Amino acid sequence: MERDTCDVLSRSKSASEETLHSCNEEEDPFRGMEPYLVRRLSSRSIQLPPLAFRQLEQADLRSESENIPRPTSLPLKILPLIAVTSADSSGFDVDNGTSAGRSPLDPMTSPGSGLILQANFVHSQRRESFLYRSDSDYDLSPKSMSRNSSIASDIHGDDLIVTPFAQVLASLRTVRNNFAALTNLQDRAPSKRSPMCNQPSINKATITEEAYQKLASETLEELDWCLDQLETLQTRHSVSEMASNKFKRMLNRELTHLSEMSRSGNQVSEYISNTFLDKQHEVEIPSPTQKEKEKKKRPMSQISGVKKLMHSSSLTNSCIPRFGVKTEQEDVLAKELEDVNKWGLHVFRIAELSGNRPLTVIMHTIFQERDLLKTFKIPVDTLITYLMTLEDHYHADVAYHNNIHAADVVQSTHVLLSTPALEAVFTDLEILAAIFASAIHDVDHPGVSNQFLINTNSELALMYNDSSVLENHHLAVGFKLLQEENCDIFQNLTKKQRQSLRKMVIDIVLATDMSKHMNLLADLKTMVETKKVTSSGVLLLDNYSDRIQVLQNMVHCADLSNPTKPLQLYRQWTDRIMEEFFRQGDRERERGMEISPMCDKHNASVEKSQVGFIDYIVHPLWETWADLVHPDAQDILDTLEDNREWYQSTIPQSPSPAPDDQEEGRQGQTEKFQFELTLEEDCESDTEKDSGSQVEEDTSCSDSKTLCTQDSESTEIPLDEQVEEEAVAEEESQPETCVPDDCCPDT
């Protein structure tokens, strides 16, 4: 069996190498990658990947060549189905866990702190993310498989476990059960570690000696694999970091595949790597101008960006408008706000009808809907004063990270908090923290990335030591504004409540730093899979770490929710993020800096960037969230897949190059962006910059387009002001595509 496995992998690898050499440089990379996103037909029980696959992953981490995978036919389907059980009804203390002596009227009390994990049943052949690919999948050429075939299709019939720590627990459970069977100890009273599903009973007296020895040998191999995993775990790292490192390694391979297939694929790969992986870059800081030098002489004694505004003088409880702001279209606005509890609220329409006050209107509506004003004794005039002051500190001239985005994230978080699976799970204070964090999470955003601020030696980067620069600034401004006149909406909270809320808000907003994405995803997936393996299907959420982890991922999902919204909204968000990226690219060009990935308006592929963004970032995140709240997020996943297919269909087809061009493309592959991901935080690779500059200098990309803003003002923004004759001729031979605005990740 071992020889057969090696032969298959060897043949697959050869086929992969031959196909890679034959592909055209400008061929669409994502069509080739589609077979890797396997379709799950059903999910009925938890299942470990075969031991041979797990050993391949382990071997990939080792430098010793003698570590040969040991295949096994050990039956692994011994883990429990996710059962529905009662949630714990005790209260929860943010600092100290459950508290039996808390009054039912205490806003910190939760009616139920347990989250029930539901079994994943059949759902319409949806593709799975790259997280469910085994290491052996990477040896298969994307060109050698049809769209509907997958080597992993048999494996994925059940709920496959992919996080290493959960795999170790499941494997040890297998070892325990087989040990009990081999030693005739099955008659003992069942314990919490006994199998909770229908496992075929094995009796030593009824099986042959050969089968007995085979089962014993394979059980020993499982135990060896567990020991190998645990030996690599360092004491200073958490078990969820095992998953984080694994996911980063898998994403690294995916991006390397993508970068080798086309110039635009290389650009998308570089963007995803630079934005969503926690990597440090050595940069050449340009010499500051005289004006900048004079500006930096001022002491950093105050939080920058805070403006003195007066909204409270004209507000009294008796004259507060119905939705917090004055508007001549109150009835129409009321009609739109009827969808405030639904996914896909038309937030751009809300902005138009409210005089560009969507954040104030939506926050006020949600606070009324959830009765938070009464629960926390918040004066309505104080709430409106704070919200208008906060909204004024979002920059109207920033295309994406503005008050409309903040309102969208607030409303999305509100809907996610209301999902049936999370009913009665979180306390009122936790709900308040999540909504408040969503409202302030991008306040005073300058429209450039953290890396831009670091590269330009900005005052903010100096103040926050290059660590989550913008996220720290958003928090500082959001809390500082509470000190303005009649703005303290938390004035009637107890000291303990206020401290707890502040801690939660800080943890949630810092988690919106996109460079922390893979760590967040790995933590959530490890927690979900571990609970599936070790319990009857209930996440107790009886400690602060678990609860804040769910809230962090919830707001992170809301922040990356644009591709899951109706296509009309998604396209508008795409236009906006690309406009913001291009403005940053223009500033970098003016300064003589290297232009950041996806920020060069002369060389950007909007459609391919969205497909890659969904495949490698959004889909894995929402797939994991949907696992947590199953089946509540299935419609969201369906919309995400539909939107992905739409952008896929709009990718223009490039004509096949001549043989000479093809040969030239092969030679150029050695200059492609190379992803050398170092998993240890202290020694990240920074080789991307040198090789990535090759791509940015080439402005003849045929994927540049005109961005059609579908806002209320319907403006048209030319992305290519000067296009080379070859690119023009190439575009004329293809159908013209209008790329609308939409969602792209927070930078």
Swiss-Prot record:
It is found in: Cytoplasm; Membrane; Cytoplasm, Cytoskeleton; Cytoplasm, Cytoskeleton, Microtubule organizing center, Centrosome. PROSITE patterns: PDEASE_I_1, PDEASE_I_2. Pathway: Purine metabolism; 3',5'-cyclic AMP degradation; AMP from 3',5'-cyclic AMP: step 1/1. Residues 718-734 have a biased composition (Acidic residues). The keyword ATP-binding does not apply. It holds the Pfam family PDEase_I. The active site is at 401 (proton donor). One of its GO terms (cellular component) is voltage-gated calcium channel complex. Expressed in brain (at protein level). Isoform 7 is detected in heart, brain, lung, kidney and testis. Keywords: cAMP, Cell membrane, Cytoplasm, Cytoskeleton, Hydrolase, Isopeptide bond, Magnesium, Manganese, Membrane, Metal-binding, Phosphoprotein, Ubl conjugation, Zinc. Its cofactor is Zn(2+); Mg(2+); Mn(2+). GO terms for biological process: cAMP catabolic process; cAMP/PKA signal transduction; cellular response to cAMP; cellular response to epinephrine stimulus; cellular response to follicle-stimulating hormone stimulus; cellular response to lipopolysaccharide; establishment of endothelial barrier; multicellular organism growth. Belongs to the cyclic nucleotide phosphodiesterase family. PDE4 subfamily. This is 3',5'-cyclic-AMP phosphodiesterase 4D.
